[in-house]
Swiss-Prot record:
This is Methyl-CpG-binding domain-containing protein 7. The gene is MBD7. Residues 1-21 are annotated as: Disordered. It comes from Arabidopsis thaliana. The lineage of its organism: Eukaryota, Viridiplantae, Streptophyta, Embryophyta, Tracheophyta. Residues 21-92, 106-171, 172-242 form the MBD domain. The modification Asymmetric dimethylarginine is found at residues 118, 145, 174.
């Protein structure tokens, strides 16, 4: 009794003869030197031949040049990606989403010159029952993982925009210039909070009624409309008038220009709360009225910057 082998020598021979090594020079400029190109007829014997590209050293097979591009673009080891040869001149961008030919019109590409920054790594995870390898781009500092370079680029761009926004907010919150004082005619509206001893101040521009919540906002506004310069800021000094109280409990005070501001004032903080000071100008103590006015100005300055 004879048994028939499931894989006879003649069948193996036919399978080997069907694999044809193609001339790699026909793909010159599209693949790196050393790659092997194999033409493999389909088992249906309908004359269709599939082309496979074999990576030297690893033996990995790729069914398209696009798959090779994605594979090579993701190979980094904590260094910036480098691109060499004419292979990288044209189609070097990596896309995410559907990879079928019908959907290529809707794919999203990373920028042509995009590189992984330092501190990133690439993980390769082979799929089960498949020759396909999934790549994950990992930010080591945070542990965040991304499936494509375009996702990494989008994440970095959004993070950069967020940092720039925070910097703009911090710049807007900066205090006003040290020597800045309200111009003549401006009104300060002080309104005590109901559930707190804190007093909210608003600075009102005469004529327009524009209201600002801080001295820094007033200074930025005056600079933007061209009503103030750095020289005028450094020369402006003001003396506060007594506060006025209306029926609603809102206090108002105006600012006037002191035509002869002192060049130097020697002062020392006093009082239990540290909100009073004694002042000496040209060897003489200032009057109690002036000290009281300056004390209010000093407390207001501290609260504006807090």
């Amino acid at each position: 009794m004879q048994t028939r082998s499931s894989s006879s020598p003649s069948a193996n021979h036919r399978r080997e003869t069907q694999l044809q090594i193609a001339d790699p020079t026909s793909f010159c400029g599209k693949i790196m030197p050393g790659w092997t190109v194999v033409n493999r007829p389909r088992s249906s014997n309908n004359g269709v031949v599939d082309t496979y590209f074999i990576e030297p050293g690893t033996g990995r097979q790729f069914s398209s040049l696009e798959a090779i591009h994605r594979h090579l673009a993701g190979e980094v080891n904590d260094r910036r990606l480098t691109r060499a040869g004419s292979f990288f001149q044209d189609k070097t961008r990596v896309y995410e989403g559907s990879r079928t030919k019908q959907d290529h019109c809707g794919v999203e590409y990373a920028s042509k010159g995009f590189r992984l920054p330092r501190g990133w790594s690439v993980e390769e995870v082979p799929r089960k029952n498949s020759h396909y390898i999934d790549k994950y781009y990992v930010e080591r500092k945070t542990g965040k993982r991304f499936r494509s370079l375009v996702s990494v680029e989008r994440y970095l761009r959004e993070s950069r925009n967020s940092i720039e926004q925070q910097l703009r907010v911090l710049q807007n919150r900066r205090g006003h210039s040290k020597d800045f004082r309200l111009p003549d005619g401006w009104i300060v509206e002080e309104k005590p909070r109901r559930s707190s001893s804190h007093i909210d101040r608003s600075y009102i521009e005469p004529g327009t009624g524009n209201k600002f919540r801080s001295m820094a906002a007033v200074e930025r506004y005056l600079i933007s409309v061209g009503n103030i310069t750095l020289d005028s800021v450094s020369m402006v000094h003001s003396e506060r008038l007594p506060l006025l109280m209306n029926r609603n409990g809102i206090r108002f005070q105006s600012e006037v220009i002191d035509p002869n501001p002192p060049k130097k004032v020697k002062w020392v903080l006093t009082g239990s709360g540290g909100n009073m000071f004694t002042a000496n100008v040209r060897g003489s103590n200032v009057s109690s009225l002036v000290k009281h006015t300056w004390s209010e100005a000093f407390v207001s300055l501290i609260e504006d910057r807090s």
